[in-house]
Regions:
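Residue-level detector of functionally pivotal "anchor" positions at catalytic/ligand-binding pockets or at interdomain
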Residues: 277-300, 365
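C-terminal tail/sorting-segment detector
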Residues: 3, 347-365
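N-terminal cap/lid segment of alpha/beta-hydrolase-fold proteins
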Residues: 24-69
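Glycine-centered coil/turn sites that cap beta-strands in beta-rich domains
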Residues: 289-319, 335-340
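Gly/Ser-rich "nucleophile elbow"/oxyanion-hole loop immediately N-terminal to the catalytic nucleophile
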Residues: 69, 114-157
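Short beta-strand element of the alpha/beta-hydrolase
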Residues: 70-79
Length: 365
């Protein structure tokens, strides 16, 4: 499995900035990728005043009613002969996590991928119009630099093609895509789901080739669901819910540009995932790592099985964080208790904020 991660951490951080960074990530956990998410959801269609673009046939926009704008957006198109209901589950799911979602029908049920690509671009135009339509509940609430596309089967091939046609698209989610002889020269972060037992778009003839056809300079991920069929990614519940968790993390990371989701992917969801028969990955994201100025205090041992001791001459406040930015403990180091105890935590990397600096601590067995 290819893993290409860029690690960075805040040289010359102020305490305020450090607290801000960790505070933003504190609520980003596997549990936070729930179905549904934290926000209530409402829907709009043409009867509510949204446009019906010339390159698609009918749409529903799902949006959060109590989220925090501005929102990212994603357009989704179904597959060959299929209607919007085939991918409908994605709308409320994304919207409940703060991502406005437009799901469209096609002018013809037998439209090929290129037509579906233009349908997706037209759907994004409808999203843009909602940001300025005076009667829209989304007036002024959309971040038009955070746009993504998705599609099932031929719609998945169309989503990749849409990214070629419009380089401003930030992300692609291809659901068991179908498109022979792919040409995907684009820079949009591409997540490709496939089903191991898909007989309509066999991965070896489609998804695998799509991954290879996506440039090496583009962030990309291929997740093949074990025993999955052609519709295994039509819902966020696919692959024992791993499909939804990975898709949401991908959009949060690359479309919303929220680096808190990097370790959810790199340290958990993509580490020997039980739902996957194959994972290929070549993407860069920012992890919390240790490039701070070297701590003036001596500390040992590191790695450790339990305690890390510090040679201190005055009382110092500390905060210990997980790789996900969750604060695990806080307290004070002193001459009577000059150590951090990791014995109750799982094996792995932890980050200690002490004396306005960050120390990476490693627990081993």
């Amino acid at each position: 499995m290819k893993r290409n991660y860029f690690s960075i951490l805040f040289a010359f951080l102020t305490p305020l900035l450090l607290h801000s960074v960790y505070g933003q990530c504190e609520g980003v956990t596997l549990e936070s990728l729930s179905i549904p998410g934290p926000f209530s959801v409402a829907a709009l269609d043409e009867e509510d005043g949204i446009r019906n673009g010339p390159d698609y046939n009918g749409a529903t926009i799902y949006y959060p009613t109590n989220g925090i704008p501005p929102y990212a957006s994603i357009a989704i198109v179904p597959g060959f002969t299929a209607g919007p209901s085939s991918v409908e589950a994605w709308g409320p799911f994304y919207a409940s996590h703060g991502i406005v979602t437009i799901i469209i029908g096609t002018n013809s049920p037998i439209d090929f991928p290129e037509a579906r690509a233009y349908a997706l671009l037209d759907a994004l135009e409808t999203i843009k119009q909602e940001n300025i339509r005076s009667a829209s509940p989304l007036l002024g609430d959309l971040n038009l630099e955070q746009l993504a596309v998705s599609g099932w089967s031929m719609g998945g091939g169309g989503a990749q093609r849409a990214a070629v046609l419009d380089p401003t698209i930030a992300g692609v989610i291809a659901l068991c895509p179908w498109l022979p002889n792919p040409d995907f020269d684009h820079n949009s972060a591409a997540l490709i789901f496939s089903g191991q037992d898909d007989t309509v778009a066999p991965p070896s003839l489609h998804a695998d080739l799509h991954y290879e056809a996506t440039p090496v300079s583009t962030n990309k991920l291929l997740f093949e669901v074990e025993n999955g069929d052609h519709s295994v990614a039509n819902s966020p519940t696919g692959g024992d819910y791993s499909v939804g968790k990975i898709a949401l993390s991908w959009l949060k990371l690359y479309v919303e540009q929220n680096d808190c989701y990097c370790p959810l992917l790199t340290d958990n969801l993509l580490v020997d995932p039980p739902a996957a028969s194959k994972v290929e990955q070549d993407f860069i994201c920012e992890l919390l790592a240790n490039n701070s100025p070297e701590l003036a205090l001596n500390y040992y041992p590191n790695p450790t099985q339990d305690r890390v001791y510090f040679e201190i001459f005055q009382e110092l406040n500390f905060e210990l964080y997980s790789p996900y930015g969750q604060r695990l403990q806080s307290g004070q180091l002193s001459s009577s208790q000059p150590y951090i105890d990791l014995s109750t935590y799982a094996l792995g990397i932890y980050y200690l904020n002490i004396d306005n600096q960050v120390v990476k601590l490693i627990k081993t067995n």
